[in-house]
């Protein structure tokens, strides 16, 4: 069903200073925002945490952009708070490795809004599923370094992404990697306020979240970076859990059973009593990556510290000797180019697509 035309309808707003409504003059209906009519939707390229994303052309400039329609279907009183958070955060952020919010445009009837973002030709999840040969270690280092630079910028600006995963990492044809989808991101301060633990896609979720902590710091992003680095190195997800219990068990199988000795405060986490953790005394990272250098293993160990306070920061990782030894990270411009999967109409995600990356 087509949206009503603005030119044919009056828009009336409730006045908060006195009773009644007033009619918005036609020349002020869009405020300082452009209309979505000025963009030609080319194809749907995906779905973020809180909205559908299209590849589109700005008819004024001919620029190709990503147009993210903000979900309003469950809202009766305006823009969802999650979308307001994303807009507010993205307007503050300007970094080469963070997706850029160019502007906000409005739908025909002012009941829908769209975020105009910088367009990236690829996302890493699609690449991992479709590329004929895996990334080389030099290419993996190039990708992860860019993710870390973007994260260091976020964390210095007191922002936690809270949903890092390969599908939220985009890449341009020039090899520039950008972190996207800030629908779950939060600004934090001191002292850290409680937040819901039900964030971060399961495979990338830190153990403290799985065990119910409401104290979230930048360390949850760093655990996810460890999962991403391991996934790129192994060419498949490291911890593909099917439930929260299974996810915890996979972590214990890989890293050993946590205890108060290595993770002070572990026994007081809200959900510890609900799980019976297997007794597993060994860290098996070296067995998982027998070919990885000592520096690479040290970096993974640092990222997978159980104790969030001891876990590597983005700055720590950027100083890691792993990125300074051979094979050295390749330059972004030398990253391979790939067919533009995002330029095709996106098919709905299937379990078959996920299992493809899970096979040994």
Swiss-Prot record:
> Binding of ATP: at which residues?
45-53, 68
User: Assembly and partners?
Assistant: Heterodimer with CCNQ, the interaction is required for kinase activity. Interacts with ETS2. Interacts with PRK2.
Q: What catalytic activity is recorded?
A: L-seryl-[protein] + ATP = O-phospho-L-seryl-[protein] + ADP + H(+); L-threonyl-[protein] + ATP = O-phospho-L-threonyl-[protein] + ADP + H(+)
Name one matching Pfam family.
Pkinase
Q: Which residues does the Swiss-Prot or TrEMBL record annotate as the active site? A: 163 (proton acceptor)
Q: Which organism is it from?
A: Homo sapiens (Human)
InterPro entries this protein is in?
CDK, Kinase-like_dom_sf, Prot_kinase_dom, Protein_kinase_ATP_BS, Ser/Thr_kinase_AS, STKc_CDK10
Keywords in alphabetical order: ATP-binding, Cell projection, Cilium biogenesis/degradation, Cytoplasm, Cytoskeleton, Kinase, Nucleotide-binding, Phosphoprotein, Serine/threonine-protein kinase, Transferase
What functional role does this protein have? Cyclin-dependent kinase that phosphorylates the transcription factor ETS2 (in vitro) and positively controls its proteasomal degradation (in cells). Involved in the regulation of actin cytoskeleton organization through the phosphorylation of actin dynamics regulators such as PKN2. Is a negative regulator of ciliogenesis through phosphorylation of PKN2 and promotion of RhoA signaling.
Compartments, as annotated in UniProt? Cytoplasm, Cytoskeleton, Cilium basal body
The disorder this protein is implicated in is: Al Kaissi syndrome: An autosomal recessive developmental disorder characterized by growth retardation, spine malformation, facial dysmorphisms, and developmental delay.
What Gene Ontology terms for biological process does this UniProt record contain?
A: cell projection organization; negative regulation of cell population proliferation; negative regulation of cilium assembly; peptidyl-threonine phosphorylation; positive regulation of MAPK cascade; regulation of actin cytoskeleton organization; regulation of cell cycle; regulation of cell cycle G2/M phase transition
Tell me what this protein is called. Cyclin-dependent kinase 10
The chain positions of domain Protein kinase read 39-323
Residue ranges of region Disordered? 334-360
GO CC entries:
ciliary basal body; cyclin-dependent protein kinase holoenzyme complex; cytoplasm; nucleus
Q: Which residues carry this modification: Phosphothreonine?
A: 196
- Which SUPFAM superfamilies does the entry mention? Protein kinase-like (PK-like)
> Which enzyme type, at the first EC level?
transferase
User: Which protein family is named in the record?
Assistant: Belongs to the protein kinase superfamily. CMGC Ser/Thr protein kinase family. CDC2/CDKX subfamily.
């Amino acid at each position: 069903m087509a949206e009503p035309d603005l030119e044919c309808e009056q828009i009336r707003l409730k006045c908060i200073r006195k009773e009644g409504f007033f009619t918005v003059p036609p020349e002020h209906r869009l405020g300082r925002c452009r209309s979505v009519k000025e963009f030609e939707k080319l194809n749907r390229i995906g779905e973020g945490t809180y909205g559908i994303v299209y590849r589109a052309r700005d008819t004024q400039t001919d620029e190709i952009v990503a147009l993210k329609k903000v979900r309003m279907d469950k809202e009766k009183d305006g823009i969802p708070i999650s979308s307001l958070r994303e807009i507010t955060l993205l307007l503050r952020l300007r970094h080469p490795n963070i997706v850029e919010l160019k502007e906000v445009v409005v739908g025909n009837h002012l009941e829908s809004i769209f975020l105009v973002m910088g367009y990236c030709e690829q996302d890493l999840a699609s690449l991992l599923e479709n590329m004929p040969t895996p990334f080389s270690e030099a290419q993996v280092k190039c990708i992860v370094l860019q993710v870390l630079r973007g994260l260091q910028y976020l964390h210095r600006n007191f922002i936690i992404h809270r949903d890092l995963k390969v599908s939220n990492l985009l890449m341009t044809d020039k090899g520039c990697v950008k972190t996207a989808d800030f629908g779950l991101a939060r600004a934090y301060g001191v002292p850290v306020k409680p937040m819901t633990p039900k964030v971060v896609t399961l495979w990338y979720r830190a153990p403290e979240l799985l065990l119910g902590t409401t104290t979230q710091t930048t360390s949850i992003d760093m655990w996810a970076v460890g999962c991403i680095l391991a996934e790129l190195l192994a060419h498949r997800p490291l911890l593909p859990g099917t439930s929260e219990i299974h996810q915890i068990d996979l972590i214990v199988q890989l890293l050993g059973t946590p205890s108060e000795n290595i993770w002070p405060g572990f026994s007081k986490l809200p959900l510890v009593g609900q799980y019976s953790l297997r007794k597993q005394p060994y860290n098996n990272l070296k067995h998982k990556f027998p070919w990885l250098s000592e520096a690479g293993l040290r970096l993974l160990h640092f990222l997978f510290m159980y104790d969030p306070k001891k876990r590597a920061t983005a700055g720590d990782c950027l100083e890691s000797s792993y990125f300074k030894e051979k094979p050295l990270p390749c330059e972004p411009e030398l990253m391979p180019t790939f067919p533009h999967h995002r330029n095709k109409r996106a098919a709905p995600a299937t379990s078959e697509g996920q299992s493809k990356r899970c096979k040994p």
